[in-house]
Regions:
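Conserved ABC ATPase "signature" C-loop
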Residues: 212-213
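Conserved ABC transporter NBD signature motif
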Residues: 60-68, 77
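Helix-to-loop junction immediately C-terminal to a conserved catalytic motif
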Residues: 52
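ABC ATPase "signature
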Residues: 218-219, 227
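Conserved ABC ATPase signature
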Residues: 133-137, 141
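Conserved ABC ATPase "signature" region
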Residues: 104, 111-129, 181
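Catalytic Walker B motif of ABC-type/P-loop ATPase nucleotide-binding domains
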Residues: 158-162
Length: 241
């Protein structure tokens, strides 16, 4: 547990009588980027939402840097995470206001907000759009703003639920490359759900395969290719090659 930025232990989650998650152990190491893969309905997005404290598990425990996340401390830990969905979900205001919104809610000084917002807009190459309305952004621009809005909060753990899925291939390829460089520089512990095999070699240090809500294998991409534990994992690994 010492190396885990976040860990899910013996997590069970049901919808009605159907068990969606049965995760014995899932650890995201400090500074690691983990890709969650599996067929539709395998529990990837649900696991992310449980770990991001959006869904309450029926059983099990979550740990953040070794500390158990209790109901009393949930808000404290939630402030140290960020979550980005497939849709950018931007506010109908300027790019600057979107990225600044979380910092304002936490009471940061205007000078600090200005510096942090413009720094992240520059990192994503959209600083010239700071005063633009989000209504007029392209898909790629909107996703860059959405990622900047998450990262400006300086999260220790970042969750991504197919954030690039809606983009065309050239835009997606460029953004994944840029974002991968940012993750390597910041060393933010990251979990991302993907159905796109092209994202994994560029972004991930580790791949975790889910089937029917269970973690079947969690290893480096190379180990996944060389030593799949069963035919299902071999099938998923072949999709990445």
């Amino acid at each position: 547990m010492d190396d885990c930025a976040m860990m899910a232990s013996n997590i069970k989650y049901h919808r009605g009588n159907k068990q969606i998650l049965d995760v014995e152990n899932f650890c995201v190491n400090k500074g690691e980027t983990v890709a969650l893969i599996g067929i539709n309905g395998s529990g990837k997005s649900t696991l992310v939402q449980v770990m991001a404290l959006l869904l309450k598990p029926d059983e099990g425990s979550l740990f953040f840097h070794g500390q158990e996340i209790t109901p009393q401390k949930m808000l404290h830990f939630r402030r140290r995470m960020a979550l980005v969905f497939q849709e950018s979900l931007l506010l109908d205001t300027t790019v600057y206001n979107n990225v600044a919104s979380g910092l304002r809610l936490r009471g940061h000084k205007k000078s600090e907000i200005d510096a942090r917002v413009m720094d992240w807009l520059k990192k994503f190459g959209v600083e010239s759009l700071a005063s633009s309305s989000t209504r007029f952004l392209s898909g790629g621009e909107a996703h860059r703003v959405s990622l900047a809005r998450a990262l400006v909060m300086d999260p220790e753990v970042l969750f991504l639920d197919e954030p690039f899925a809606a983009l065309d291939f050239p835009t997606k390829k460029a953004l994944i490359s840029e974002f991968s460089d940012i993750l390597k520089a910041t060393k933010i512990s990251t979990v991302f759900v993907t159905h796109d095999p092209h994202e994994i070699p560029v972004m991930a240090n580790k791949v975790t395969v889910l089937e029917a809500g269970k973690v079947i294998q969690s290893s480096t991409t190379q180990d996944l290719f060389a030593h799949p534990v069963n035919d299902y994992v071999a099938f998923m690994a072949n999709a990445i090659k």
